[in-house]
A protein has these predicted regions:
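Conserved Rossmann-fold NAD(P)-dependent oxidoreductase catalytic core, especially the SDR/UDP-sugar
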Residues: 14, 38-81
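Active-site beta-alpha turn of Rossmann-fold NAD(P)-dependent dehydrogenases/reductases
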Residues: 16, 55-58, 79, 106-108, ...
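Flexible, glycine-rich beta-alpha linker
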Residues: 63-66, 80-81, 103-122, 143
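Short-chain dehydrogenase/reductase
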Residues: 28-34, 74, 78-90, 115-122, ...
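NAD(P)H-binding glycine-rich loop region in Rossmannoid oxidoreductase-like domains
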Residues: 1-32
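Hydrophobic positions on the long internal alpha-helix
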Residues: 36, 40-44, 92-93, 155, ...
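C-terminal substrate-binding subdomain of Rossmann-fold SDR/epimerase-dehydratase oxidoreductases
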Residues: 129-216
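Active-site Tyr-X1-5-Lys
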Residues: 65-66, 77-103, 128-129
Length: 216
């Protein structure tokens, strides 16, 4: 709170979170993603001059295993603690909507240079780069709306410029790609083959098998 008072931000982009779905500590997920966000909003609401916009990053994981192309009105059906924490964060943030200019975003899967190798795309790329013969993955029958982190950042920048309206926005490409497509693309780029093995330890119950957003 003291640091917020010193900085007096004009616009805020809140990305701090436990973002790895398979993070093993559920208590930490909720403490960081929900309580941590509430602490930030409380500090911002205490400022004499409000920021013009406070952008809060939720996640498309809140939709769960919904079918079809998903817009912001699609019902929420979170399938893991990470997704539940993001849904709870959204509900908590609504309590501050009359005091702060909020913008909620639900980004679909995105990746880029520097992302940790525990995430899917960097893990696959790293295995091909090292010339590995085998890669162990969890559920392979999945498809996602993959996005470039630079496009996500540009979307956030545009939404920040609009001012906080209390609205929720999907950040997505509107295109869905299977895990098998990603593997085949890397085979083509690298000129290498790799054996894909399913490691039961990586298989998650209630896996979200398909996510595609409506960016219209």
């Amino acid at each position: 709170k003291q640091r917020i008072a010193e900085v007096r931000p004009q616009r805020v982009v809140h990305l701090a979170a436990i973002s790895f779905v398979a993070h093993g500590d559920a208590d930490e997920i909720y403490r960081v993603n929900v309580v941590g966000t509430r602490n930030l909003l409380e500090a911002l609401a205490s400022l004499e001059q409000m920021p013009a916009n406070v952008l809060l990053a939720s996640s498309a994981n809140v939709y769960g295993n919904a079918s079809g192309v998903l817009d912001e009105q699609a019902p929420l059906s979170p399938q893991n603690d990470y997704a539940v924490s993001k849904m709870a964060m959204e509900a908590m943030a609504a309590l501050w909507a009359d005091r702060l200019p909020l913008t909620l975003v639900r980004p679909f899967n995105y990746t880029g240079v520097g992302q940790d190798e525990k995430f899917l795309i960097p893990k696959i790329v790293a295995h091909f780069r090292r010339g590995a013969d085998v890669i162990e993955l969890g559920n392979t029958d999945v498809s996602c709306d993959f996005n470039d982190v630079r496009g996500v950042a540009a979307a956030y920048e545009g939404l920040l410029a609009m001012g906080g309206s209390g609205q929720t926005y999907n950040v997505c490409s509107g295109q869905e790609h299977s895990l098998q497509e990603v593997i085949e693309r890397m085979r083509g780029i690298s000129g290498r083959d790799i054996e894909v093995k399913v490691n039961p330890a990586f298989v998650r119950a209630n896996e979200v098998k398909s996510l595609r957003g409506d960016n219209g």
